[in-house]
Amino acid sequence: MKTLLLCVGLLLSWERGQVLGDQLVSDNELQEMSTQGSKYIDREIQNAVKGVQEIKTLIEKTNEERKTLLSVLEEAKKNKEDALNETRDSETKLKAFPEVCNETMMALWEECKPCLKQTCMKFYARVCRSGSGLVGRQLEEFLNQSSPFYFWINGDRIDSLLENDRQQSHVLDVMQDSFNRATGIMDELFQDRFFTHKPQDTFYHSPFSYFRRPPLHYAKSRLVRNIMPLSLYGPLNFQDMFQPFFEMIHQAQQAMDVHLHSPAYQTPNVEFITGGPDDRAVCKEIRHNSTGCLRMKDQCAKCQEILSVDCSANNPSQNQLRQELNDSLRLAEELTKRYNELLQSYQWKMLNTSSLLDQPNEQFNWVSQLANLTQGPDQYYLRVSTVTSHTSESEAPSRVTEVVVKLFDSDPITITIPEEVSRDNPKFMETVAEKALQEYRKKKRVE
């Protein structure tokens, strides 16, 4: 009978959360432990706010760097387009001349085409693989419709430059649009009084304390979405404060990410323009319009002879124009490559900005998830329910303290504290709260 009464007594003590070995933990002690743990959670919430403000500073710095790079990019774009215009002008003037050396070039072209087709199809079958039959028919038609004069003036290189220019302009427009929408959202966000007014340290104390801080009334924000409509000195209200913020962060990141990994966003590769290897780009161009096959002219002697045909004896002016065309073409290719390098740098800057927007979600999103909590009369967001002490089950047994807490809306969380951190240690509840918050964040990430 005594044993039964003892078990009932222990169970009742456990239910009231007052067991620590043989020593009772009073309600006042549990309350004080809850207060100390809640203060740590409060500091972590304030750190989340500071962290977001640091992200704001980084984004502003990145934006200034982006503007500088954009200025360089615009200048490079102008130089490239000037060179392209000169190339097109020279091409137009050259086409206006009657075709000279026509018989010589046509004879060489008839010998060039079979070699070019064979070389291209071997490459396609080995590297590109899919759809060789269709590509072969398209190539046959393309070569029959092409002129050796087009070949002679490097028309394929000119067309590639023009197509590349179109793609580069599109990529830049997409990046600018996505960045402008993202920064517009961020500007709206950081204009809110939540970020523009800071509490004075002399008046600040924990929102978990018993006393309300005196209210300070600010003019209502012009934002439709107000992040913190109540006083900064009132108790924390997660629904009003954090949820709208993280929704806007998510919107800003979506505005940038919508195009970041799409094919339209990828900068065109120009290595093949100046002779560099880029098999994927060549495969794509061959499938698109067969002009990629013309890049293999160096492997066919008769094709090379077409490029070497000298018509200056028949028309010196035409030869001079061709030289001007080749010079402007080389310059345009160099400037196009340089512009593409700058465009890729700009793209990396944009990706870096997107990753900065991701940091608040990674580090502080747990705070926004508190928005669904019911703000009840309970002033504690970490409440200690039980404290027990026993010997650990390990190869080297030692005394440990187990603390069961509820953090926000969580199920009970059991935290084990080694004997090195005694309950009298000022760091005891900070350690408990830190481990509880780690468990809480881990579970929220899984959910």
Curated annotation (Swiss-Prot):
Its main location: secreted. The keyword Amino-acid biosynthesis does not apply. One of its GO terms (molecular function) is misfolded protein binding. One of its GO terms (cellular component) is mitochondrial inner membrane. Residues 1-22 form the signal peptide. SMART domains: CLa, CLb. It is found in: Secreted; Nucleus; Cytoplasm; Mitochondrion membrane. Glycans are attached at N85, N102, N144, N289, N326, N352, N372. It is a peripheral membrane protein. Disulfide bonds join C101-C311, C112-C303, C115-C300, C120-C293, C128-C283. A motif (Nuclear localization signal) lies at residues 77-80, 441-445. One of its GO terms (biological process) is chaperone-mediated protein folding. Keywords: Chaperone, Cytoplasm, Cytoplasmic vesicle, Disulfide bond, Endoplasmic reticulum, Glycoprotein, Membrane, Microsome, Mitochondrion, Nucleus, Phosphoprotein, Secreted, Signal, Ubl conjugation. Pfam families: Clusterin. Proteolytically cleaved on its way through the secretory system, probably within the Golgi lumen. Proteolytic cleavage is not necessary for its chaperone activity. All non-secreted forms are not proteolytically cleaved. Chaperone activity of uncleaved forms is dependent on a non-reducing environment. The modification Phosphoserine is found at S132, S394. The keyword Magnesium does not apply. Functions as extracellular chaperone that prevents aggregation of non native proteins. Prevents stress-induced aggregation of blood plasma proteins. Inhibits formation of amyloid fibrils by APP, APOC2, B2M, CALCA, CSN3, SNCA and aggregation-prone LYZ variants (in vitro). Does not require ATP. Maintains partially unfolded proteins in a state appropriate for subsequent refolding by other chaperones, such as HSPA8/HSC70. Does not refold proteins by itself. Belongs to the clusterin family. PANTHER family: CLUSTERIN. Antiparallel disulfide-linked heterodimer of an alpha chain and a beta chain. Self-associates and forms higher oligomers. Interacts with a broad range of misfolded proteins, including APP, APOC2 and LYZ. Slightly acidic pH promotes interaction with misfolded proteins. Forms high-molecular weight oligomers upon interaction with misfolded proteins. Interacts with APOA1, LRP2, CLUAP1 and PON1. Interacts with the complement membrane attack complex. Interacts (via alpha chain) with XRCC6. This is Clusterin. It comes from Oryctolagus cuniculus (Rabbit). The gene is CLU.
